[in-house]
Structures are given as structure tokens and as C-alpha cells.
């Protein structure tokens, strides 16, 4: 189990909560917004944070905090996945994943050693990576953007 798998499990749980709330008639949005999970700015705020409740506020015509409460109430496998789920105004969901899940990630890292995280993504193809550096002493202009695109 990798860190990406843990994030995928959390995302699946959040989508399950949204689907469950919709089936109960608590939410009416037809299509869910893109679900993003980010690391909070402070470690005490948890492992992952989501703004999905704020993304739904306009389409639901409700306060993000109320939507976040509905999501938390409908979270599947909440006790198995989360140590703590916190709602912070205006509607942030701060999620602390159970330590046992992170311990599984650490076990995988330890067992794979230096091979952890390696992938055969490019399959031997060469890739050229360039970056654009604008003149730091002059103003930015359209040519800088053109140089980045070409």
C-alpha cells in the first residue's frame, strides 16, 4: 500500500459519502466537482484536507459548513480509515488517517528499499525537460509566454 493508495481510499470514502447523501436526498447536485486532497498547511490540522464542501456550496445553495457536516455523517468506513475528521469553517474537511494505514505504507517502503517509487513509465524513451527563465531585471511580456510554449 503506497501513500497514493491511502489518498485514493480517502477520496473513495469522500465520494461514497457524497453518493450516500444524494441517495438520502440530503444533496441534489447532479455531478460532483473534482475532488482534491491536499496536505494541510499545519500538521495539527491532519494528514489531508478537502474543500469539496465549499465547491458544492453554490450548486447546493447551502452553507459549506452544513454540506461538510452531511459529508461527515455519510462517510463510509469512517472508523476504519480515520483517526479524526474535523470540519473547520467555512467548510474545510481536515482528515487524520489512522496510523495503521500509514504503518502499512512504511512497511511497503521498507520492504521495497531503493526500488520503492520506481516506475517504468517512459519505457526507455528520452525526455527533454526545459524551463523558462524570464529576465529578472526587466518586465514580463508576451514573448516570455511564447518562449515557454515553443
Where are the regions a protein language model picked out?
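Structured, non-catalytic alpha/beta "coupling" segments that mediate domain-domain communication
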Residues: 76-111
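Short, hydrophobic/aliphatic alpha-helical segments
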Residues: 27-41, 124-136
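Short, charge-patterned binding micro-sites
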Residues: 33-51, 83-88, 92-93
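N-terminal catalytic cores of NTP/NDP-binding nucleotidyl/phosphoryl-transfer enzymes
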Residues: 59, 103-150
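Short, small/acidic-rich helices and loops at N termini and domain boundaries
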Residues: 44, 48-66
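Short, well-structured alpha-helical segments that form the helix of a local strand-helix-strand
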Residues: 68-76
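Charged, compositionally biased N-terminal leader segments and the immediate start
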Residues: 1-37
Amino acid at each position: 500500500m503506497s501513500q497514493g493508495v491511502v489518498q485514493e481510499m480517502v477520496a473513495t470514502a469522500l465520494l461514497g459519502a457524497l453518493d450516500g447523501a444524494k441517495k438520502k436526498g440530503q444533496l441534489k447536485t447532479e455531478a460532483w466537482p473534482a475532488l482534491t486532497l491536499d496536505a494541510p498547511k499545519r500538521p495539527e490540522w491532519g494528514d489531508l484536507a478537502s474543500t469539496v464542501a465549499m465547491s458544492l456550496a453554490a450548486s447546493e445553495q447551502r452553507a459549506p459548513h452544513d454540506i461538510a457536516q452531511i459529508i461527515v455523517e455519510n462517510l463510509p468506513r469512517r472508523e476504519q480509515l480515520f483517526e479524526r475528521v474535523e470540519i473547520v469553517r467555512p467548510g474545510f474537511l481536515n482528515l487524520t488517517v489512522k496510523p495503521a494505514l500509514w504503518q502499512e505504507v512504511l512497511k511497503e517502503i521498507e520492504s521495497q528499499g531503493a526500488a520503492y517509487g520506481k516506475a517504468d513509465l517512459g519505457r526507455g524513451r528520452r525526455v527533454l525537460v526545459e524551463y523558462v527563465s524570464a529576465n529578472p531585471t526587466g518586465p514580463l511580456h508576451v514573448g516570455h509566454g511564447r518562449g515557454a510554449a515553443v
